[in-house]
Every structure is written in structure tokens, then in C-alpha cells.
Amino acid sequence: GDSIANGADDDGSGSVALLAIARAMQHGPVRPRRSMLFVWHVGEEKGLLGSSWFVNHPTVPIDSIVAELNADMIGRNAPDLLYLVGPRVSPNNQSRRLGALVDSVNAAEPMPFRVDRTFDAASHPEHIYERSDHFNYARKGIPIVFFTTGLHAEYHQPGDEASKIDFVKLARVSQLLLDVGRAVGNATARPR
């Protein structure tokens, strides 16, 4: 084998989801009331560089961004398990309402995920909340939810290959993100 970490899950899975969701939003029967931004950030592993740049040089007024949904590593581990990070640990409880919206949308899915909030704690030793791009949005007061299926032995390793992705799970997480995005996009109030 080689020594290249191809990143099928970290973060090919999130990129695939973002493309699929953007396409579904564009070609769906009804577009959301709010505009949507689909943003890929670079330099996450080097210190959240891309998201830091974006929130400090946004392409739209920063106060017009009502929520940030982050999908990173969403294609592995138990088929019914999804970790959500942000609603409990975000500053000033700014993401609690968005977290409640995610919970209600998940409950309405044909096969709801078993949600684990283990990482949604400031005291968690892995500090997951501070390790992905949603963090910079939260620092600007934007409600966030980070969707992940969790860490695995191939994280940042050559074994993070497409053959290990659970594509059914990836599709289900993508559908949930699409449905949450539509709910946020059609809500009359900001998810504060």
C-alpha cells in the first residue's frame, strides 16, 4: 500500500454531501425562502484557515448568515449513529434553537438517527467543537450544528479509503442535512 491519506471520509464524505445537497436545492420542486451559501473551506487541518478567512471576509454581510450546518466525516461507523456538536457548547446558547430544529427534523425522517451528543461539551478531551470549520462561525455569533459520524482508526491515515464508506449512511446523513437546510431556509424566524 501507499502512504497517502486519501481522505474518503475526512472529508470526501462531507464534500459529496455538499454537492448533492446543492444540486437537490437547485433542482427541487420548491426553493427555500432564504438564499443558501454552499461553502468549501480549505486549511481546516492547519488551523481552520479557510473558515477563518471566510467569516472575516464574507461574500455576503455576516449578519445575513442565519445558520451554519457543517458536515465533516459523515460516512462511517454504526449505521444508525450520528454525532451532533454545537447546540449545547456554543457561546450564549446561540445554537440551542437550531439544535432543537435538527432534532425535530431527524425525528420526522423515515429512519431517524440515534443522536449522540458526547462531543457537544466544552470539557470533552477531544475538543471536537473547536476542531472543525463551524467553530469560526460560532465565534461570530452564528448558530451552528456540526454533523459527524465520529472518529475511526483510519482518521488521517492511508486507510481512509472509499471502500470503507457506508454509502447508505452517507445518503441518509445527506438527506437529513438537506431537510434541515430546507427547514432553516423556510423558517420565518432566525434559528437563535
Task: Give residue spans per PLM region.
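Alpha-helical metal-binding/catalytic segments enriched in His/Glu/Asp
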Residues: 1-48, 177
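Solvent-exposed, polar/charged alpha-helical surfaces in well-ordered, non-transmembrane soluble domains
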Residues: 16-23, 52, 96, 100, ...
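Secondary-structure transition/capping motifs at alpha-helix termini
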Residues: 24-34, 58-64, 108, 187-191
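His/Asp/Glu-rich mid-to-C-terminal helical/loop segments that flank catalytic regions of hydrolases
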Residues: 148-192
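Short beta-alpha connecting loops at secondary-structure transitions
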Residues: 3, 80-91, 157-168
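Metal-dependent peptidase/peptidase-like ectodomains
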Residues: 41-146
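C-terminal soluble interaction/assembly domains
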Residues: 7, 21-31, 51, 55, ...
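Active/binding-pocket-proximal capping segment
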Residues: 11, 36, 73, 87, ...
